[in-house]
UniProtKB/Swiss-Prot annotation:
<dbReference type="InterPro" id="IPR035987">
    <property type="entry name" value="Ribosomal_uS8_sf"/>
</dbReference>
<dbReference type="GO" id="GO:0006412">
    <property type="term" value="P:translation"/>
</dbReference>
<comment type="subunit">
    <text>Part of the 30S ribosomal subunit. Contacts proteins S5 and S12.</text>
</comment>
<keyword id="KW-0694">RNA-binding</keyword>
<dbReference type="GO" id="GO:1990904">
    <property type="term" value="C:ribonucleoprotein complex"/>
</dbReference>
<comment type="function">
    <text>One of the primary rRNA binding proteins, it binds directly to 16S rRNA central domain where it helps coordinate assembly of the platform of the 30S subunit.</text>
</comment>
<dbReference type="InterPro" id="IPR000630">
    <property type="entry name" value="Ribosomal_uS8"/>
</dbReference>
<protein>
    <recommendedName>
        <fullName>Small ribosomal subunit protein uS8</fullName>
    </recommendedName>
</protein>
<keyword id="KW-0689">Ribosomal protein</keyword>
<keyword id="KW-0687">Ribonucleoprotein</keyword>
<comment type="similarity">
    <text>Belongs to the universal ribosomal protein uS8 family.</text>
</comment>
<dbReference type="Pfam" id="PF00410">
    <property type="entry name" value="Ribosomal_S8"/>
</dbReference>
<dbReference type="GO" id="GO:0019843">
    <property type="term" value="F:rRNA binding"/>
</dbReference>
<dbReference type="InterPro" id="IPR047863">
    <property type="entry name" value="Ribosomal_uS8_CS"/>
</dbReference>
<dbReference type="GO" id="GO:0003735">
    <property type="term" value="F:structural constituent of ribosome"/>
</dbReference>
<keyword id="KW-0699">rRNA-binding</keyword>
<dbReference type="GO" id="GO:0005840">
    <property type="term" value="C:ribosome"/>
</dbReference>
Length: 132
């Protein structure tokens, strides 16, 4: 059985790993997933990630980030735009997620970026997911 939404699979694996208090999580790699992980790392939601090759298949391993008292850095991570229903937004329509404590991750003509960076560049796009 083939997977229809690879990004949703990645987000679910990260969410489940945080709920299980795992240190690392791995999944098959792709360019869009790497771009999303770049944004998560830049915004401070994950420690780091590496891409490795096993049997001609690329895998990404993500080092999850926890606070000193063991709380997860990501409370919620949800897919917004799905293959069956794409969600696009102009930058003026994107209000701060959780009173600017969370972020939206957007796919724009200038690449994948957070809503904060999109506000600076004044560009909208497809809303991939929301993170808090």
């Amino acid at each position: 059985m083939s997977m229809t939404d690879n990004v949703a699979d990645m987000l679910t694996r990260i969410r489940n790993a945080y709920k299980s208090k795992l240190i690392n999580v791995s999944f098959p790699s792709s360019k869009i997933k790497t771009s999303i992980l770049d944004v998560l790392q830049k915004e401070g939601y994950i420690k780091d990630y590496i891409t490795t090759q096993k049997n001609n298949i690329s895998y990404t391993e993500v080092a999850l980030k926890y606070s000193v008292n063991g709380d997860a850095s990501i409370c919620e991570i949800h897919r917004v735009s799905k293959p069956g229903k794409r969600v696009y937004s102009a930058i003026k329509d994107l209000k701060g997620y959780y009173n600017n404590m969370g972020i939206y991750i957007l796919s724009t003509p200038y690449g994948v970026m957070s809503d904060r960076e999109a506000h600076i560049k004044n560009v909208g796009g497809e809303v991939i997911c929301k993170v808090f």
